[in-house]
Amino acid sequence: MGKIRILHVVQAAGGVDRYIRMLLKYFDKDKFENVLVCSQDFQEEDYDGLVNSFEQIEMNRAIGAKDIKSIGEVRKLIRKYNPDIVYAHSSKAGAIARVADIGLKNHCVYNPHGWAFNMRCSDKKRMMYTAIEKIAAPFCEKIICISDAEKQSALEKRICKENKLQVIFNGVDIEAYENGEHGKVKKADLNIPEDAFVVGMVGRISLQKAPDVFVKMAKLVKEKVSNAHFIIVGNGNQETEIRKYAEDNGFADSLHITGWVDDPMSYVELFDAACLLSRWEGFGLVLPEYMMAGKPIVASNVDAIPNLIKDGGNGLLVEVDDTVGASEAVLRIHQEIELRDKLIAHGYEDVHRRFNARRVSEEHEALFEEMLK
């Protein structure tokens, strides 16, 4: 038997881009050949050495008439490469690829990377997203869920039968981090004093990641810890409001927003407490990244996050939109050294045991080989 050829279709960049690169890095190249069909948001040089072929077509996040053209182009590429498996990533590419693959003689797998119907949106949109997933579900053989919570959501919404769902927990590239360069970013680079207590978050400055809760929490922490500083690693459409809140409340000099960066872990290394206060979350990849860096975690008790974080074990959980609870959790990390050390130790153990990128690739390989038997 020759190599198994997988054709990946992906529209959304960001976290999905990072996931695919990590997945491809640890695939057995003696057994698998990978083709990437992606949107204009991807960079070909990022995939040097990871894929055998790179194809770029126009795919847009919004639903529209251009989707018909995207479907046609994906179908042409499926015919051109004749893969054993089409692997569709995220909801938009998932719909496009599954429709494009109808009637073709290969296997099809879909990974939503977080269900669109779990987003905080209008009931009308939620119903539309749910309907699209139900309609498209018969056109693939397996749906990969990145957490148990994602699988449960699919069952509750009756997207498909349980035997179509396969949980493959997300992971992080521990080897690359541990063998990489550390200390590239210094506190002084951000005008943060060396003795500052630094609280940080990594994520888009948008509704999902709750930067408004983070900055309100920051105000409460600053009132108790005068040398506290706060870092947001990311960019997004709420940045102006976040900066204005800090300015209006007198701590603008203590809030540092990096914008989009190539290496967020360089900034995570500065954190004394690491937050993910999301309003919804399919997995929360930054959580094992925090663990990998040895950071105590404060996270929201929502969706997949409790699958990763056990309150008082490898992190502290607070309710969604609970500004006071988040500030109290951060203050506990500041004040209780034994608790902080315990959270760090348990997190470090968990990330090595449960969230290693090699395991993610190996579980995919096993699934694909089983499908082709």
Residue ranges, per PLM feature:
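N-terminal strand-loop element at the rim of the active site
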Residues: 7-70, 149-153, 158, 237
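A conserved mid-protein helix/loop that constitutes part of the nucleotide-sugar donor-binding site
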Residues: 17-22, 197, 201-223, 230, ...
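Short His-centered aromatic/hydrophobic patch
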Residues: 88-94, 112
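A short, active-site helix/loop in glycosyltransferases that binds the activated sugar's phosphate group
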Residues: 139-164, 172-176
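Aromatic "clamp/platform" in nucleotide-sugar-dependent glycosyltransferases that forms part
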Residues: 260, 279
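Short hydrophobic beta-strand element within catalytic cores of glycosyltransferases
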Residues: 296-299, 309
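Conserved acidic donor-binding segment of nucleotide-sugar-dependent glycosyltransferases
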Residues: 311-312, 316-323, 332-337
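A short, well-ordered alpha-helix in the C-terminal region of glycosyltransferases
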Residues: 325, 332, 339-354, 360-366
